[in-house]
Design a protein with these regions (language model features):
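ATP-dependent NMP and nucleoside kinases share a basic, alpha-helical "lid"
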Residues: 1-32
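Loop-centered beta-sheet repeat module
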Residues: 253-254
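A glycine-rich, Thr/Ser-enriched phosphate-binding loop motif common to dinucleotide/cofactor-binding enzymes
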Residues: 250
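Short, flexible, glycine/charge-rich loop motifs used to bind or transfer phosphoryl groups or to couple energy/partner
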Residues: 2, 58-59, 207
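Transition-metal
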Residues: 66-244
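Active-site neighborhood of divalent metal-dependent phosphoester bond hydrolases
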Residues: 247
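Small-molecule kinase domains that catalyze NTP-dependent phosphoryl transfer to phosphate-bearing small molecules
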Residues: 25-87
Length: 254
């Protein structure tokens, strides 16, 4: 593309989980800003709704024509591969089963089930969720001989959307992976948060997103007497909900 007219094009890439860790340590700022001292949550929100989307639009044109990709995830240990090598690796990945690199994070409702099942650090206060198969936030490890290169897994979505998603899904959502897979752990922790997602028209007008979030839950494990203790799984809110009848809806069970 004309905007990338240069003798050599090198993309310095960074996994988004690593970017979040650097934001939490106040080492990096948002795109075009001098705000590295801001709250980590504010840095993340701006990254999610602005920075990543702006950069992904550039990446769509940049990835097919770059000469080299530079993995910058490990400070002081940069790893360089050619653009052709990257394209071949992602084309190969899109045609076979693969998985992304999961990450785990504490939270308000966090429990300790994943510590037992996944062998996680028991010194952490809790583990509220595991992000696994969320390409816009997880990363992908590519092996080249005895070297491993880490890239945002969303690079694969941007470069091979049809091969990865299929024609019908790509026609509806474009180069975006429209499903997020999370593990939520409340065992030994607290109640999940109340989530409110806007309708499609609102989220498109105010956040620039083309679809809203619908959710489906699978219970993988539970205490044997969970329902005897009166613990219920709420089925969500209904259009007829008002402040007056909220207690009534609060007792619905999925």
């Amino acid at each position: 593309a004309a905007q990338f007219d240069a003798d050599i094009i090198i993309l310095a890439d960074l996994a988004r989980w690593e970017a979040q860790q650097r934001q939490r340590r106040h080492e990096i700022a948002n795109l075009g800003a001098d705000n590295h001292t801001a709250q980590a949550g504010e840095l993340y929100k701006r990254s999610y709704f602005v920075d990543w989307r702006v950069c992904d639009r550039w990446k769509q044109d940049l990835l097919p024509v770059l000469d080299y990709l530079l993995d910058t995830n490990e400070p002081g240990v940069p790893r360089l591969i050619s653009g052709d090598t990257l394209l071949d690796a992602l084309q190969h990945t899109s045609a076979r089963p693969f998985r992304v690199v999961p990450f785990f994070d504490p939270g308000l409702w966090g429990g300790h089930w994943m510590e037992e099942i996944c062998g996680l650090d028991r010194d952490a206060p809790n583990h509220a969720w595991c992000f696994d198969c969320v390409p816009e936030e997880n990363s992908l490890l590519l092996g080249f001989g005895d070297q491993t290169v880490e890239i945002p897994s969303n690079d694969l979505v941007l470069l091979e959307p049809v091969a990865l998603l299929g024609d019908a899904v790509h026609a509806r959502f474009g180069p975006e992976f429209p499903i997020r897979f999370d593990l939520l752990d409340t065992m030994g922790g607290g109640n999940l948060s109340l989530q409110v997602h806007p309708v499609t028209e609102y989220i498109q007008a105010h956040f620039g997103l083309h679809y809203t979030q619908d959710e489906s839950y699978y219970i993988l494990d539970a205490e044997t007497d969970i329902f005897k203790q009166g613990n219920l799984l709420g089925s969500g809110l209904a259009s007829a909900l008002t402040l007056e009848n909220l207690p009534e809806f609060g007792h619905s069970v999925a």
